[in-house]
Amino acid sequence: MDWTWRILFLVAAVTDAYSQMQLVQSGAEVKKTGSSVKVSCKASGYTFTYRYLHWVRQAPGQALEWMGWITPFNGNTNYAQKFQDRVTITRDRSMSTAYMELSSLRSEDTAMYYCAR
């Protein structure tokens, strides 16, 4: 596989053992540079609209990097300046699911992407 032209997106499921709250993300993605990716995060075990939902990422050997948040109740968003022009966070209240779309992918976007409450 030619990794020069592809970007690997990995996602993880996060569980809160105390409240049985779960955030379950979509699976790994391999994308070409210049393309876009949309990752989903389905919430359960709590009222989806009551909590901010954040997206963070961690590139290999790097610290966690905050990308932005959404308020599921009204859809308000706030993005880190670094991603302002390339990231879009949305939500589907009826499905208790949030989405993070990252466009104009670069090799340095190779990372683990997490949603977090």
Curated annotation (Swiss-Prot):
The keyword Transcription does not apply. Residues 78-115 are annotated as: Framework-3. The keyword Nucleotide-binding does not apply. It comes from the Eukaryota. Residues 20-44 are annotated as: Framework-1. Residues 1-19 form the signal peptide. This is Immunoglobulin heavy variable 1-45. The gene is IGHV1-45.
